[in-house]
Regions:
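Active-site donor-binding loop signature of nucleotide-sugar glycosyltransferases
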Residues: 97, 155, 182
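Short, small-residue-enriched loops and turns at beta-alpha junctions
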Residues: 101-103, 157-161
């Protein structure tokens, strides 16, 4: 993410203030953040495609301070990992992954089932992070395919190649995703919620 990182996304640092604002909403208890994080081993197969990055236990695998919260639950990419029944005590759930796709972690489905039990039917995932044409795309597409509403926070995502990022945004909006700003995402948290039976 950051300059000097092994898999730096140029321009991503300009998104950090908006990523922090979105994360602050979780710190204030207004929203639960469901995120993913690469947690690779030194000999990970993904390194045949990308340079080694986010190796578990190294500074490069740490979440940047602006998007780090206190009450976080990290769920490893293992079928035997336990997903607590009650996630209400957390500000952020991190699904660890070793590929681009968060849905390769078998526990992603369990977290979504939990979220579905406790959210309104009109709940929407606001997606932010890097890189638009890789991890952001796969997370958004996976959610849309599972019937979730998705908004891409356009001023809190960044792409490796602008033309690929634009194609990705066009693809995702054609599948039903909305494009919103950080201000719009935060304003949506202020609207009163009504639950329908």
């Amino acid at each position: 993410m950051l300059p000097g990182g092994k898999l730096h996304v140029p321009g991503a640092e300009k998104c950090i203030p908006n990523m922090k604002r979105l994360t602050d909403a979780a710190r204030e208890g207004r929203v639960l953040i469901i995120g993913d994080a690469c947690t690779h081993t030194p000999d990970d197969p993904e390194f045949q495609r990308f340079p080694p990055h986010c190796i578990r236990g190294t500074p490069g695998a740490e979440i940047i301070p602006e998007t780090r919260v206190v009450k976080v639950l990290s769920i490893p990419n293992r079928p035997d990992a336990v997903v607590p029944q009650d996630l209400s005590g957390y500000q952020q759930i991190i699904l660890e992954k070793q590929t681009l796709d968060v849905f390769d972690n078998p526990n992603t489905e369990a977290v979504l089932k939990h979220i579905a039990r406790f959210t309104d039917a009109d709940a929407e995932f606001c997606i932010f992070g890097v890189a638009t044409e890789y991890c952001v795309r796969l997370a958004a597409k996976g959610l849309l395919e599972r019937g979730w509403r998705v908004a891409l926070v356009r001023d809190a995502i960044e792409t490796l190649k602008p033309e690929d990022g634009q194609k990705t945004i066009e693809e995702l909006t054609s599948l039903g995703a909305r494009l919103i700003s950080t201000d719009q995402a935060l304003a949506a948290l202020e609207r009163p919620k009504t639950r329908t039976a």
